[in-house]
C-alpha cells in the first residue's frame, strides 16, 4: 500500500426520521433540498496510508474505534464496495499485481475476516468446519488422500489448535439460539477463515471474546502459518497483551484515519518515547500505542515536552511524514517495487490455482470446486440446517395436514351436479391459495450476512446457495404437500381416477414451488424485510385475484389483464379445472328453470339449466362447456400450461440466483451517529465548540490527564454516592447440569463464593469454562438442573432478587428507536420503586450519564451497528441501563470490555472500581485483562474446564496473593513485568493446545485457602441469617412498580418506537394504499349484471385477504420487541410481559386506522357502488375500524404463542386459510357439511364479509348481460311471462322478455338480496353481526 486514501459520503452525523416527516411532506421536501449539499459532503476514511507487508510477515494495526482500522483492512482486502460514494486513491498491489487485477483473478488469496461472528446457528461446529474445508478442497492432495481423510485431517487440525474438539456436536448458535459460548464461536469463525486458505489475511479484531491464553494461541498459530506457508497477516487487536504484541513483525498506528506510525514492532515504542510520550509501568506496548491516540488516555509526557508533543491527528500525521522512519518506509516500498517480479507472481498463482481447481471448474473462475460441486455441498448443508431446526418442518407439515382435513371436510363429497361446480372450483383454488400463503413464510433475511461473508471467502457463488436452498428445502416441503393433496383430494370427492389425481398432485407441486420461488426472488431484490413484505403483499393480491377464480378473463379490465398471464397460478388453476371437469356430466339438479309446483310434467324442451354453459332442452351441463363459457378454458391447454409453469419455475429460480449473485450489500459511509429529531443543530454546535476548545487547549488537556493518571486511583468520587449495595450474596456448591446426547452434561461443578458490598470480583477462565453459565445461573437466568445454595444475607432468594440485581449482558441489546437518555429513563422508572419521585429518578439518570461520560451522545438514537451507536457507546449504555436501576444487591457484568479497545476497557474497569469503592457489589467476567486492568479487581474466581473452581480469594496488591498461591502449588515463578492474568491462565493449562500435569481443581479442594473460604462462607451464612430474620417481605414483590405505572411508560416507549420507525410505517402505508388501488381498479365499476355480484363478493373477500401480508408485517416488527424482552428485560423483571402485547396493539391501531382509511377511499369508490353516507360510512366502520381491531390482535396473539417468527408465519398461513375457508366466499354455508356449519358461525371473517357484501348488494337491481341469460321455449300458445308466472311465486330472478313466445331469456337474480340469500347472507344481519364482532 502506497499513499492510499479513501473518502466516502459523510453520514457520520444524521438526524433521525419520524412519521412526522410524512405528515409534513412539503416541508420535508423543502428541508431536504436545503440540506442536499451537506448530504453529498465527503469525509476522510483513510488518508495517506502506506505499508509494506512481505511474505511471512504479521502486521498489527492499532487504533481506537473510529480510527479507521476496519477500513484499513477492508481496503487492503479489496472489500470497499460498502463505502458509500467511496473514492480510493493511491496504489495497492500484491507482489506486484495491482489490486483490481488481483480481485478479478486471484481474489480467494485475499481474505477479510470481520469482527462479527455470523454462522448458521443450527449447524454444529463439525458441520460448519467440514463445509468450509470441502469448499476449498484441492483437486491434487498430498499422498493422494481421499476427500474424507482430507476433511477429517484438516478439521482435527483446526479443532486442536483452537480447542474445538469437544464442541463438534454442539450447535454454533447465536444471540438468540443457544450453542457454543461466545469465545468458542469466535474460534469457529477463525478456524473457518483459515479453512478458506488465503495467502493474505486481514483479521478484524479476531481475538474479541477470547480469553488471554486462547488469544495468544491464535496469534502464535498465525505466526506459525506465516512462517511455514509464507502467508501475510494484517490484524487489528483492541486489547493486545505484550506476548501477543511480540508475535508481530510490524505495527501501524492509526488516528482518525491518519497513519501516525508504521514500522517494526521493536521500534514503535522508542519512536513515541522520543516524541515525548512515556510508557507507564506495567502497561503493554499495544496499550501504550493506543493510549497516545486518545486525549484522555493513560499516558505521560516527558518533563519539558508538554508543549512540544503533537496532540491532534493532523499534528501526529505531520510529525510522521517528516520523520526518518517514514522516509525509510517509502524507500523500502520503492525498493521492493523494483525487485518484485510481477509475471512470476502471476505464474505462481495460476499454477497453484490450476492444481487446486477441481474438474469442471471454469478456467477463469477463482473458486476451488466446480459450480456443480458448490451446489452439491450447499444442498447437503441445507439438509443439515433443516434437520437442525426441526420445529419449522414439523409445524409446516402439521399445519398442512390439519388444513387438508379441515378444508377437505369443508368441501366433503361436493355434489357432482351443477350445485357443486362452484365448490369444486373453490377447493382447487383454495389449495393453490394456501400454498401461496405458505410461500410468504419463505421470505427471510437472516442468512444474508452469512452469504456475504462466504462470498468474501470465495467458498462458493451466492447463486449456488440460492439454487441449493431450493433443492434442499423441496423434499421437506413435499412431505406436507403430499399429505395435503391426498387428504384434501379424497375428502372433497374430486374426480376419482389415477390420472386426474396425479395430474392435480403434479400441478399443485409445480405451482407451489413456482410461487415459493417467486417470493424468494422478491426477497433477493430487497434490502429490508419490511420492504420485501410490502412487495410480497401486492404479489399475493395479484396471485389471489388474477388466478381467474375471482375474476374471470372476460371480466378483467385491460389495464390489469396482463397480470394474469405472468403468474403461474393462472395456468395451474386452468389445468386443475380441466383435469377435474373434463368429460364430467353435471346434472342440473335444483337449477332447472322453471321447476317446482305446477311444472312436474313439463317437457325438457320447455326447461333450461340455469347455469353457465347450459344448452336449451338439456338437463345437464358438460364440464368442458362450463369451463369454456365461464373461464374461456380449453382442455387442450392442460399440458401446455404445465410447460409454461416449468418455464416460470425455472425463470424465478434463475432470476433469484442472478439477483443473489450480484446483489450488493447496503452501502454506508461508516458509523453514523443518529440524533433525535430537533436536536441535530444544537448538538452540532455543541460538538463544534467542544472540538475548537480541544484543539486550542490540547496541551493543557494532556497535562491535566497526566495529573489525573498520577493521582490516587482509589479516590472515590462524590458522583458515586448512593450506589452502595445493601446485601451479601453467597453461593455454595452450585452445580448446573443439562441434558446431552450422551446423557447428562455438567457445566458447573460445586462452585462456591460470595460477593460483599464494596468489592470488585473478577470471574476468569478460558473460553468455554463456564463463566457466562455461572453468571446466568447465579442471576437465575438458566434453565436446567441446578443444585446448591444461593443466598442473600444468609436467606434463600425471594421474588425481588432479579430486579434488585443488575445484569450487563455480553450482547448489547437495546431498543433501536430510543435515545440513550430515553433508554436510561425507562430503565430507571421500571427498576426503581414507584414510591421514589420521578424527578429523583431523572436526576439520577443525569448523574449516570455524567459518570459514564455519555453527555455527547445522550440524545442519539441507539440504532443499529453502523447506523447508530458504536460498540463502545453501546457498552456504556448497557452498563448505564443497569446502573440507573440502582441495584441494591449485586451488579453482574458479562464481558463488559469485549469488543472495546484497551483505552475504552480501561475506562470501563476504572468506572467499575469507583462503583465498588462507593459500596457496590460487583461480579464481572473478563476475557483479556491487562496487568493494569487485572489489578483493579479485589477478588478472583478462577474456573477451569468443566466449570470447576481453581481459585477463589483475594488478588492482593500487585496480584501478590494469587501469584503466591500458584507458585507455592507448583507453577513456575511469575516474572516481574509479566501480566498476572496471562500467567495464571498459562499455569492452569488454559488454551486449546496447552496442558499441565497438576490437577488444579483437586489442589484447590485440598488447599488451606479452600478450607478458609468454606469456613468463612459458613460463618457468614450463620451470622447473616440470624440478623436478617426480622426483615419483612416488603421487598419480595416481583416488580418494582404497579401494573398501571408500567402500562403508562411501556405505552409511551412503544409509541416512540413506532413514530421513529419510518421504514416500517412507510411499508405498511404502501401495502394498504397500493392494495386498495389494486383491488379498486381490478373490480372497477362492478356493474349491475350477475357477474358483477360475484365480483362484488370477491372484492370484499380480497379486502379481507389483505390481513395476511399485513399480519406478517406486524409480526416482523413485534418480534424485535419480543426477543429483546425475552433475552434482557424479562430477566430483570422490568414489567409484565402482557404489557408488551397490549401496548404494541394500541400503537398499531392509529396507523392502521389512518392507512385503512386510505385503503377504503382507494378501493371502495372505484367499485362504482352506493356512495351515500348511510352505506359508505357503515362500510368504513366495519372495515377500516372493526376489522383492523380484529386482525392486529390476531397477529400478535399468534406471534406470542409461537417459538419464533418463521413458525408464526406458518401458523398465520394456517389460521388465515382456516378463517377464509369458512367465511362463505369459496364455499356457501348451504353446501358445507352439517358438522362444519358451526365453524362458519364461529369465524369472525364470516360476519365481516356478510356486512361488507350486504352493504354493496342490498336493494341493488340486477340486469343480466346477454351471455348470462338462460334460454328456453314456453309451450305453444303461451308467452314467457304467462308460462313462468307460477315459478316466480317462489323462485328468484326474472324473465327479460316476458311477452316473447320463444327463446325466453331467464336471469338468475332480480335484485342483489337474492344473491345474498344464496351465500347465506342478508342485509338484515348487519347490526347483529356488529354485535358478534
From Swiss-Prot:
Membrane topology value: Multi-pass membrane protein
Signal peptide limits: none
Membrane-traversing stretches: 13-33, 392-412, 425-445, 474-494, 499-519, 534-554, 642-662, 1071-1091, 1092-1112, 1150-1170, 1178-1198, 1210-1230, 1235-1255
Record-linked Pfam families: ABC2_membrane (PF01061), ABC2_membrane_7 (PF19055), ABC_tran (PF00005), PDR_CDR (PF06422)
Keyword terms of this UniProt record: ATP-binding, Glycoprotein, Membrane, Nucleotide-binding, Repeat, Transmembrane, Transmembrane helix, Transport
Places the protein is found: Membrane
Keyword Cell inner membrane assigned: no
Residues bound to ATP: 765-772
InterPro entries assigned: AAA+_ATPase, ABC2_TM, ABC_transporter-like_ATP-bd, ABC_transporter-like_CS, ABCG_dom, ABCG_PDR_1, ABCG_PDR_2, P-loop_NTPase
One annotated GO molecular function: ATP hydrolysis activity
Occurrences of domain ABC transporter (ranges): 30-281, 729-971
Any GO BP annotation: sterol homeostasis
GO cellular component, one term: plasma membrane
Family: Belongs to the ABC transporter superfamily. ABCG family. PDR (TC 3.A.1.205) subfamily.
Name of this chain's protein: ABC transporter ATP-binding protein/permease PDR18
